[in-house]
Amino acid sequence: MSTSTEKRSKENLPWVEKYRPETLDEVYGQNEVITTVRKFVDEGKLPHLLFYGPPGTGKTSTIVALAREIYGKNYSNMVLELNASDDRGIDVVRNQIKDFASTRQIFSKGFKLIILDEADAMTNAAQNALRRVIERYTKNTRFCVLANYAHKLTPALLSRCTRFRFQPLPQEAIERRIANVLVHEKLKLSPNAEKALIELSNGDMRRVLNVLQSCKATLDNPDEDEISDDVIYECCGAPRPSDLKAVLKSILEDDWGTAHYTLNKVRSAKGLALIDLIEGIVKILEDYELQNEETRVHLLTKLADIEYSISKGGNDQIQGSAVIGAIKASFENETVKANV
């Protein structure tokens, strides 16, 4: 493939792949994990690994970059990548994993590596089968298990891996990656837009890149136009702080009918999901100064129950009324010191 063709091919990639770190030095925000894993490799004592933590924190990028440093051009022969959320049953363990782990490369020294992404989606039977395969083929194969939630993995599987928790990326790491992308894509991002993007990402770099790519697609002239915070909120489908405050102010100060009208008006005008409004309102309520902390406890518990009902398919109109009722009831005898 020619250089120009490769360049065009890379330009057409989703940004989460286009800007995926190729070396461990390019992985941001997980310095302790990188240092420890590198030490394992340098000493020739790489154990089975478990990387767990929220999405978009660099779990897959770290192990793939590590594997490329270890194997170089022989990567495709020595590494098997599987996504357990696609093949979550016992057959994938018995067939693909076992077949790969049981064979040796004639002209290659060292161990093979099996990367099992989203392993917390595997059934318990598949995890138990995987544990037996790990035990049997440890001599020539290493496993790296990736998961969002470690508690969804069986204790037997957990005990056979050295665990590393990937924290949500710190603001500094996200800012560095955003700056890098803006330079390469020749984009302009307002300070308020960058602040909104970092806040909405919750430490998820994958979401940052997806939102930036969506924002670029909305611009008439990407080389000249600046991405505003309104564009960020629009592409995220997230409520703006001003909308959240307007809804909360109406609930606290207006009668039931007006509050219900305001809530529905904001939702329909901005195309917002009720669950996003609840999450935004909770963040605002966390900063309120209350005379009685029991008010906060009672209200957050009620909102959590409503959020759970929505996740189980509850009617949005009914749950929207429940939100108004929960907030009004909780603040009925409470003096709010903070202004909306």
From Swiss-Prot:
Protein biosynthesis found in the keyword field: no
Compartment annotation: Nucleus
Alphabetical GO biological process terms: DNA damage checkpoint signaling; DNA repair; DNA-templated DNA replication; leading strand elongation; mismatch repair; mitotic sister chromatid cohesion
Keywords recorded for this protein, A-Z: Acetylation, ATP-binding, Cell cycle, DNA replication, DNA-binding, Nucleotide-binding, Nucleus
Modified sites of kind N-acetylserine: 2
Classification via Pfam families: AAA, AAA_lid_RFC1, Rep_fac_C
Entry's Gene Ontology molecular function annotations: ATP binding; ATP hydrolysis activity; DNA binding
Coiled-coil intervals, chain numbering: none
InterPro entries xref list: AAA+_ATPase, ATPase_AAA_core, DNA_pol3_clamp-load_cplx_C, DNA_Rep/Repair_Clamp_Loader, P-loop_NTPase, Rep_factorC_C
GO cellular component terms, A-Z: Ctf18 RFC-like complex; cytosol; DNA replication factor C complex; Elg1 RFC-like complex; nucleus; Rad17 RFC-like complex
Family label: Belongs to the activator 1 small subunits family.
Functional note: Component of ATP-dependent clamp loader (RFC and RFC-like) complexes for DNA clamps, such as the POL30/PCNA homotrimer and the checkpoint clamp DDC1:MEC3:RAD17 complex. During a clamp loading circle, the RFC:clamp complex binds to DNA and the recognition of the double-stranded/single-stranded junction stimulates ATP hydrolysis by RFC. The complex presumably provides bipartite ATP sites in which one subunit supplies a catalytic site for hydrolysis of ATP bound to the neighboring subunit. Dissociation of RFC from the clamp leaves the clamp encircling DNA.
Quaternary structure annotation from Swiss-Prot or TrEMBL: Replication factor C (RFC) is a heteropentamer of subunits RFC1, RFC2, RFC3, RFC4 and RFC5 and forms a complex with POL30/PCNA in the presence of ATP. Component of the RAD24-RFC complex which consists of RAD14, RFC2, RFC3, RFC4 and RFC5 and associates with the checkpoint clamp DDC1:MEC3:RAD17 complex. Component of the ELG1-RFC complex which consists of ELG1, RFC2, RFC3, RFC4 and RFC5. Component of the CTF18-RFC complex, which consists of CTF18, CTF8, DCC1, RFC2, RFC3, RFC4 and RFC5. RFC3 interacts with ECO1 and POL30/PCNA.
Protein known as: Replication factor C subunit 3
Gene coding for it: RFC3
